Amino acid sequence: DPHLYNLKIFLENENSIIDTYELKIGIRTIEVKGDQIYLNGEKIEFKGFGRHEESPITGRAQNLPQSIMDHNLLKWIGANSYRTAHYPYSEEDIELADANGFLVINEIPAVGLFFDDIKENIDIRLELCRKQIHTLINRDKNHPSVVMWSVANEPFPLDLLNRMKDGKNGPADEISTNFLNTLIEDAKTIDNSRPVTLAAIHGTPLDWLENVDVILLNRYYGWYFAQLDLDGAIEKLSNELSEIHDKTNKPIIISEFGADTIPGFHSVSDELYTEEYQLEYWKRYLEYAKKTDYVVGLHAWVLADFRTTHSTMRIGGLNHKGAFT
């Protein structure tokens, strides 16, 4: 239920107006208390999707009609939020979120950060990310729809494969931890009115989550792991999130979960890529979140199918996890 106000600023010189600037603003509070998030003093649950600014006609170029359609689809399906995965969206898109009352997790283009590089290159990358945070916050700080800053999506620890294999969550290396902590602290220093987060891949060290305000977890139990075993998938999800919550006592948003689906592909029994499996997959995650108090949000991956690299995993060069095709 958005309420926007027109703020006008006048520059005068000897009683003459020589310039004006007009900005639509909204007034709201967002804060984290314990393992809950509060909007205007009331608990809020994040219900929505990860998105891409993409059109089948114009690709990743800005397309305002496509943005309007996306926001209409979000409203129609009952969503209240989305993440700008995995880069800043156009300011026109954020203005649409303001006007429609969506909550936006705003993310810099730090996707799949790797740290197995020489120090000089890592330092260059860090300065670039710091500049991106500064630029993004300065651009979007006056948008009421923006309620959280995300400093990275799925950074990779050096020993990620071993962590995913044995399920152990030991301390991370010092280089990557310092890198991410620097970005988190920068965001908090520039804007202390919004929570700061990062979207964590399976196997992320808990060290990386110590300084975030809200924990975002990208989890694909039932798709990349425990395929066709949704009972086992939810059990693994529940066990992992329970351990993370016990050690952090922070609100958790499942920021990605999904199953690729080919339109029109059906099966009576569980079968990957069928519409039935995708629906059951989503249903299980929703049921788990509903009964888990510290899971304060779900963002399905993804709002609509999108173009990606050609591979044996990507039928037709598309990611087919979209709720819409």
Model regions and ranges:
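Aromatic-lined substrate-binding rim segments of carbohydrate-active enzymes
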Residues: D70-L126, E174-R194, D231-S242, D246
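Substrate-binding clefts and catalytic carboxylate motifs of secreted carbohydrate-active enzymes
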Residues: S145-S150, D159, D166-I190, V196-L198, ...
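Short, small-residue-rich loop/turn micro-motifs
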Residues: K43, G48-E53, N106-G112, N153, ...
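Alpha-helix capping and helix-loop boundary segments enriched in small/acidic/polar residues
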Residues: T58-Q62, P88, E120-E127, G170-I175, ...
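Secreted/periplasmic carbohydrate-active enzymes, especially glycoside hydrolases
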Residues: D1-V104, Q132-N138, N142-M148, M164-G167, ...
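A short acidic, helix-capping loop that chelates divalent metal ions and anchors anionic groups
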Residues: E53-T58, L113-D117, P157-L160, Y224-F225, ...
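Short low-complexity, flexible loop/linker segments enriched in glycine and/or proline
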Residues: L96-N100, K119-R130, D213, V268-D270, ...
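Flexible, active-site-proximal loop/turn residues at the rims of small-molecule/cofactor binding pockets
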Residues: L11, E31, S55, P88, ...
